[in-house]
Regions:
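N-terminal signal-anchor/start-transfer transmembrane helix
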Residues: 3-27
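Alpha-helical transmembrane segments and their membrane-interface exit regions
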Residues: 18, 63-72, 114-126
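Hydrophobic alpha-helical transmembrane segments
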Residues: 21-27, 44-52, 96-103
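Cytoplasmic-side transmembrane-helix entry/capping segments in multi-pass membrane proteins
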Residues: 27-42, 57-65, 81-92
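Transmembrane alpha-helix boundary signature
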Residues: 47-57, 76-82
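Loop-to-transmembrane alpha-helix initiation sites
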Residues: 55-61, 103-115
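Membrane-helix boundary connector in multi-pass membrane proteins
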Residues: 79-111
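Short, highly charged, low-complexity non-transmembrane loops/tails of multi-pass membrane proteins
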Residues: 122-138
């Protein structure tokens, strides 16, 4: 059980690198790919150097998945008028929170699943417009 906990911490570190990488590359069109590549390498290296090769694999896989997912959010936020600096600040903060939460057993693995699933869901709904107060203007 201890080894699974350590692998979960490495997975959480990969998720944190994915979120931070997405924030760093938010202004670029290829933000998801750049964030995934950086998080893959960083998550794998940290997991392997701090723990062992199994943790390195988990950190790399979760880093790539979260980089793709968070990069989709970051690119969409900047495209809709958010500032790249503000987006980066929010995503780096989210990465720190994700890393701290990964010390809870199994949460690091759940982060690796939740971030890409939420990004896929947001991407499917990307064309919809929220009516908001426009419904009252009729």
């Amino acid at each position: 059980m201890y080894e699974i906990w350590l692998i979960g911490i490495a997975a959480g570190a990969g998720a944190a690198f994915g979120l931070a990488g997405a924030g760093a590359f938010a202004r670029f069109d290829r933000a998801p790919l750049l964030a995934a590549a950086v998080a893959l390498v960083a998550g794998a290296l940290v997991g392997w150097l701090v723990f062992d090769w199994k943790a390195g694999v988990a950190g790399g896989v979760v880093g790539a998945l979260s980089g793709l997912g968070a990069g989709t959010f970051a690119r969409g936020a900047v495209r809709r008028g958010g500032t790249p600096g503000g987006t980066a600040l929010l995503l780096v903060g989210a990465g720190l929170v994700a890393f701290v939460l990964s010390f809870i057993p199994i949460v690091g693995f759940l982060e690796g699943i939740a971030i890409p699933v939420l990004a896929l869901r947001a991407r499917q709904r990307g064309g919809e417009k929220y009516a908001g107060l426009r419904t009252l203007a009729k």
